[in-house]
Regions:
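Short amphipathic alpha-helix that is part of the acyltransferase structural core
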Residues: 1-55, 82
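Short, flexible loop/turn elements at secondary-structure junctions
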Residues: 9, 56, 68-70, 85-90
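Short amphipathic alpha-helical segments, especially helix-boundary/capping motifs
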Residues: 9-16, 62, 78, 97-102
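A short linear-motif detector with a strong N-terminal bias
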Residues: 29-33, 45, 61-66, 90-94
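Catalytic micro-motifs at enzyme active sites that drive phosphoryl/nucleotidyl and oxygen chemistry
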Residues: 41, 51, 67-74, 96-102
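Short, solvent-exposed loop/turn segments that connect beta-strands within catalytic domains
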Residues: 45-46, 57-59, 72-77
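Conserved beta-strand in the GNAT
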Residues: 51-53, 59-69, 82
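Acyl-donor binding region in acyl/amide transferases
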Residues: 74-125
């Protein structure tokens, strides 16, 4: 079995969610509606990688995605990328797939990656 991790930019994501491959996947890394919303996000640049999906043959076995955003900063505005989804098939959790996906995410957005946990905000409020 061959594993492949595919990254999707804005344009590639649009093609992907309209593809026959997307329609026949056993599981999808993003819904059509969310993919279309990502494509139309005004903060999304053409070269932003929005999603990394891991496939073994034609089966989805993991994915990680981001949501581009703009926040206020000392110098005006700063472009950031929110971690928006992260999943690995249970049978692949003993391997290093989660680490591989997270590494690609950090490598791409190390200075602009934001992660939040609203449950922790309620606990420590």
């Amino acid at each position: 079995k061959i594993m492949q991790i595919k990254s999707y930019t804005k344009a590639e994501l649009k093609v992907f969610i309209h593809s026959e491959f997307f329609r026949v996947l056993n599981k999808v890394p993003i819904s059509f509606q969310r993919g279309w919303s990502q494509y139309n996000n005004p903060y999304c640049s053409d070269d932003d990688i929005l999603l990394w999906a891991a496939y073994e043959n034609a089966d989805l076995v993991g994915y990680v995605g981001v949501l581009p955003d703009i926040i206020p900063s000392e110098n005006g505005e700063k472009k950031i990328h929110w971690l928006s989804c992260f999943w690995v098939e249970e049978s692949f959790r003993q391997g290093n797939l989660a680490s591989q996906l997270f590494y690609l995410l950090i490598k791409q957005y190390k200075n602009s990656l934001y992660i939040s946990n609203f449950l922790l905000h309620r606990i420590f409020k």
